[in-house]
Amino acid sequence: MHFNNKNKSLDCLNTKIWPSPAKINLFLSVTGIRKDGYHFIQTLFQFLNYGDYLIFNTTSDKKIKLINKIHGIRNENNLIIRAAKSLKDFMWKNKNHDTPGVKIFIKKYIPIGGGLGGGSSNAATTLIALNEHWKCKLSLNTLADLGLQIGIDIPVFIYGKSAFAEGIGEKLSLFQPKEKFYLIVIPPIKISTKLIFNKFILNKKSYLKSCNQYLKKPLKNDFEPMIRKNFIIIDNLINYLSKFSNFRLTGTGSCIFSEFDSECKAKEILYKLPNKIKGFVSKGTNISYLKEILKIRSNFNVLS
């Protein structure tokens, strides 16, 4: 779903409904691999005005329920459930035993296994929304710490600002790239980040650079050669689309994207996609729609 303040399907002041925006990695460089398998990276996150939305209804039975299951993901592995349980456990350990339950509904638009951060974004939205619904009154830093225990990418969604990430992705520095239009192309496959990390062989370590140093050269993704070699459909798509623009991988895929100065130009290429290949055009934004909604609701005093 495309987000904007005029969107009638997402009422800005309806505190039961919360946006969960997608992200892209404008570049991704692998600078090393730890003994435990985690990768040292440098990457630049930017948000899209596109994503899922979640609906939260508190209950008196203290149970956490996801009303509609996400196909292919078991509840115990679902980051929404894990985030809600993490917050509830934190409140319990801090002597708050009156935290109610919740029923959660998700409307899914972000493709699963696409490298757009859907699961991490869903978890971040859950932590922020339940922090309000359950009147936990925790700081963003505390929520980010809880999120980091679940997934490396979750803190950037908690803070809601574009950022240059280092370390294993947990060290964030605010950075504001240009807000361009992006054509996101969705191949009909899912790619497991964990699987790619396990298979990735670091043949040549990228040197540590500043974000500005990366932006002076053509942007790239160190996982892309491996992905293109192992997933021929992505290789074929990038080769085909290279006639129109320079496309590259976001995250560990499967989605690829290219940036444009105008929405019209991006849509022009969208209409040239091969049959059965989906895509969408979205504006990049340095402030996530979730953060915008949080600010609007605070200004109108509709939050707890």
From Swiss-Prot:
A Gene Ontology BP annotation from the UniProt entry: terpenoid biosynthetic process
Disulfide bonds: none
Matches recorded under Gene3D superfamilies: 3.30.230.10, GHMP kinase, C-terminal domain
EC identifiers of the protein: 2.7.1.148
Record-listed ATP binding positions: P111, I112, G113, G114, G115, L116, G117, G118, G119, S120, S121
Matches recorded under Pfam families: GHMP_kinases_C, GHMP_kinases_N
Keyword annotations: ATP-binding, Isoprene biosynthesis, Kinase, Nucleotide-binding, Transferase
SUPFAM superfamilies xref list: GHMP Kinase, C-terminal domain, Ribosomal protein S5 domain 2-like
Pathway(s) it belongs to: Isoprenoid biosynthesis; isopentenyl diphosphate biosynthesis via DXP pathway; isopentenyl diphosphate from 1-deoxy-D-xylulose 5-phosphate: step 3/6
InterPro entries, per the entry: GHMP_kinase_C_dom, GHMP_kinase_C_sf, GHMP_kinase_N_dom, IspE, Ribosomal_Su5_D2-typ_SF, Ribsml_uS5_D2-typ_fold_subgr
Record: active site: K23, D153
Reactions that this protein is recorded to catalyse: 4-CDP-2-C-methyl-D-erythritol + ATP = 4-CDP-2-C-methyl-D-erythritol 2-phosphate + ADP + H(+)
Superkingdom of source: Bacteria
HAMAP family: IspE
Role: Catalyzes the phosphorylation of the position 2 hydroxy group of 4-diphosphocytidyl-2C-methyl-D-erythritol.
Family: Belongs to the GHMP kinase family. IspE subfamily.
The protein's name in its UniProt record: 4-diphosphocytidyl-2-C-methyl-D-erythritol kinase
Organism of origin: Wigglesworthia glossinidia brevipalpis
